Each structure stands twice: as C-alpha cells, then as structure tokens.
Curated annotation (Swiss-Prot):
Binds 1 [4Fe-4S] cluster. Binds 1 [3Fe-4S] cluster. Gene3D superfamilies: 3.30.70.20. Keywords: 3Fe-4S, 4Fe-4S, Electron transport, Iron, Iron-sulfur, Metal-binding, Repeat, Transport. The keyword Translocase does not apply. Its cofactor is [4Fe-4S] cluster; [3Fe-4S] cluster. It comes from the Bacteria. [3Fe-4S] cluster binds at C9, C17, C50. [4Fe-4S] cluster binds at C21, C40, C43, C46. This is Ferredoxin. One of its GO terms (molecular function) is electron transfer activity. Residues 2-30, 31-60 form the 4Fe-4S ferredoxin-type domain.
Amino acid sequence: MTYIVTDECVKCKYTDCVEVCPVDCFYEGEFMLVINPDECIDCGVCVPDCPIDAIKPESPELIEWVERAKDFIENQGWKNITKKKCALPDADKFKDEQDKFNKYIIKNMH
C-alpha cells in the first residue's frame, strides 16, 4: 500500500507534506507533486499536513494515480523534493477547481 497525491494538488503544489515525510518519497513536477509508491512506507504522516486534502490512501479507484506517479518519476524525470517551497502563485485560485489533471497536465503532455 501507498499514499497517493491526487487531482487536488494540480496547479496548487503546496509542499507542507514533504517536510514531514520520514522517507523523502515526494517527487516534483511543474504543476504537482507525486509520491513514489515504491518508497512510501504507508505511514500517513503527510496526510494531515496537506492543506487541500490531496493525499489519499491507495484504493482500487485511485490505482491510476499510482501508475501516473511511477510514469512521472521513471519516464518523465520528476525529481525528489525534501524541503518545503512556496505553493504555486495561483494556488488559492485553483484549489477548488475540479478535473485539473486532465485540464493542465494531460494538455501539456501533448
């Protein structure tokens, strides 16, 4: 099992979670963070530190997020992040928007 960063993180990228992770398993892309499922120890320490509730426990309906995280780390070269940074400039504007992954990540991959 692992924890998963979901759609809520897209275009916000609050990084409060990375500082509390005991195994430094967060990776950073331009618009969001992901958790490396092979490094996560399923402790859940990061969950309460996410101000937008973007981190969820692995479940069958979220399995696509596990595959996306692996792809971003292994094939897209996302780098490990271990220190808190400022959120994206328009994070407050985007925090309640839905379907951000399809609107902003998928769109930029083509």
